[in-house]
């Protein structure tokens, strides 16, 4: 409807049909073939390269072009003609080379992200679907004509047994899933009694219903979005209560505003004719409401009914999600307010590995769509973040690369960027809804150079139409926002005038600070921790002139208030009957001068405050991860302070700018943003990549964990060319996002060390691993064994992280010594997404001493790559000192590495009483051990 309205109001394309018709026709023609990589048939099965075809049961002979099921995987009597690579099933003859020529960014795919087609297992209930004549005809056509089979089933049985043996051997080597008898205790599995679908509702136990819905999920983006919304809302009852309160707030604002504006005769109050409210009320005021007010009231009523309808329709979905959390993830609704999202991901991955089957009844067209972009095999922390932030990652990149023009050519604005929540809503509708289709994927037509001009014109028309709609809706939005803000904050400012000086980050600053694949609750947590340091930084720049004036005004206001208060206490009648000025009693001036004193007193800096702007700003950067290049060596300057002040403003000014932006947003949509249409279309074409099983995502959001942050060394390298600058992020956004992702999902938030492994899995690893970057010493293994890390108390089982026993899962991929062989690896990442083991060991050391290390550095802590353990600027651990262990290892707490758990149980208490221990190894350590052995149990003085 919106597209048709746009095409009618705005000039149409005279050269051909509308771009919306082209997009719609292209989407319908593509259908399930929207997966370019699946049509290309060029996926490499790197996981099975070391196995021969006969070991895998000859998958090339048994896998058809449409589907793979357990029941049809090894029908050896059906020989099929192999299909040529690059051939399009639609008959168009387009291969992979043609598709990649249209979208060069697809060349940057990582073959490690490909999910082998031979590993996708589906339901074995194939006979539930009766074969249609078309299926029988297609199967007969695919089978070559042959002579009748030799009578006797013996040869066929032998061949089936051989194929079954090959398949069982492949399952044993690949560890796709465990059988019911070998499945770990506590891991949920597919119930034996599948609920029956009667057409209107499911019959069976709640757990069976939840499992049936999970198995039949076809749109993982919507499902993961509902799951995250349920997690953020803290359960069904909190979500319902929040929605009800929002509706009641809207109703109260509408009723109270109507009462104040239409049902009260203020003239009677001013003349003194009305001694009480009942005399000032307008009789039958609802019949005297004007036409525009009636229209507004009816619109509000319709909107309230729409919100109530939304709430009622959301209840079944919320109840299904509650069953999913309760019965499959084993998270009760009472624990939703305290459970972490990392624990939810761990349970979801365990559920995925315990039930590696897709939907049972699915058409071939839908199978292409599900396995191409909605594969449940791609469901670790990295893939979930890409699904949840598929659109937000593009907006983060747009703001980082400064593609959007948010300025107006007005002299008094001086090129200032204007951004607000209102403009954000318009950008989401104009850009994201235009680029993404109904399935949440980037339209393939956007990725083609041939339609660049039409797409740019269509985007410009959307900007113009959005500006027109903002002009129509601006008066209503302004009135509603002002009324709600007045009702919400006036009493707070009246009771606490100092709250007028409170600050907050602007919407533009939030998009500049947010990083790729950083979920909303994690970003808010990081941002909230920076508020005290940001306020402290701005207080590091006191204006001496302002401070002197504030002291003088504070002194005068305090003197007047003190005299009036003393006079009132001396004679209470003065407060009621004495007027200082005409119709202004004593109480009025006490309030005025008291508020003035509170405001000016807040401008006076503390006398005992230490001024160090550079140190204070580094503390802010520690959490915001934002440090432009031009801030280098200028953190103490006033220019940096003014620039930071535009990002961290007074909340009152943020509200004023929000109201002002409602008025100027149409001008931005009419004059500034249409100039960026070509760059926006080019951006989506150049920075979109395809990930098998996930779909189209922003290229910056695909972290290459094998290569680290992807930054080349800056020392000894010439200045990067224009192409590298174009295809890279600014201000080190990519590297900051990569390391922040590791901090959130590689490190356990409860313990501060890598790994989310459950206790049962952690205790299985007794030998100490080799951590190349943990201690810069040739004897790091011996140092680790004798340090506190090996002598800490054994973690009690009841203090384990909130991860169920079902998290002990069998890996779906071949064993990887660097990823899964070490307990430092995170269980929230699949083997393909595990960073190198050297980075795992060094990450905890860098994180614990990061702030001190940054304070010593004089350059950007985010832009520069992490130095090597023995690189310049990093202290080298020496044998005679224990700071490397005491600062980074001794405080690991409960999730420390146990070299010998049995011995730690017996001797842990005695060793802790003896002090710091040997301190690692070396001559001094041996001397200390010898001295301790000689004096143990005898009186004497320790020489250590």
Swiss-Prot record:
Keywords: Autophagy, Cytoplasmic vesicle, Endoplasmic reticulum, Golgi apparatus, Lipid transport, Membrane, Phosphoprotein, Transmembrane, Transmembrane helix, Transport
Compositional bias per record (Polar residues), positions renumbered to this chain: 70-86, 190-199, 776-789, 813-823
Catalysis performed (reactions): a 1,2-diacyl-sn-glycero-3-phosphocholine(in) = a 1,2-diacyl-sn-glycero-3-phosphocholine(out); a 1,2-diacyl-sn-glycero-3-phospho-L-serine(in) = a 1,2-diacyl-sn-glycero-3-phospho-L-serine(out); a 1,2-diacyl-sn-glycero-3-phosphoethanolamine(in) = a 1,2-diacyl-sn-glycero-3-phosphoethanolamine(out); a 1,2-diacyl-sn-glycero-3-phospho-(1D-myo-inositol-3-phosphate)(in) = a 1,2-diacyl-sn-glycero-3-phospho-(1D-myo-inositol-3-phosphate)(out)
Transmembrane segments: 236-256, 295-315, 550-570, 585-605
Subcellular location: Preautophagosomal structure membrane; Cytoplasmic vesicle membrane; Golgi apparatus membrane; Endoplasmic reticulum membrane
Residue ranges of the region described as Disordered: 70-113, 142-199, 753-881, 894-922
Residues exposed to the Lumenal side: 257-294, 571-584
Gene Ontology BP term (one): piecemeal microautophagy of the nucleus
UniProt PTM: Phosphorylated by atg1. Atg1 phosphorylation is required for preautophagosome elongation.
Subunit structure: Homotrimer; forms a homotrimer with a central pore that forms a path between the two membrane leaflets.
Domain of life: Eukaryota
Job of this protein: Phospholipid scramblase involved in autophagy and cytoplasm to vacuole transport (Cvt) vesicle formation. Cycles between the preautophagosomal structure/phagophore assembly site (PAS) and the cytoplasmic vesicle pool and supplies membrane for the growing autophagosome. Lipid scramblase activity plays a key role in preautophagosomal structure/phagophore assembly by distributing the phospholipids that arrive through atg2 from the cytoplasmic to the luminal leaflet of the bilayer, thereby driving autophagosomal membrane expansion. Required for mitophagy.
Protein name in the entry: Autophagy-related protein 9
One GO location term (cellular component): cytoplasmic vesicle membrane
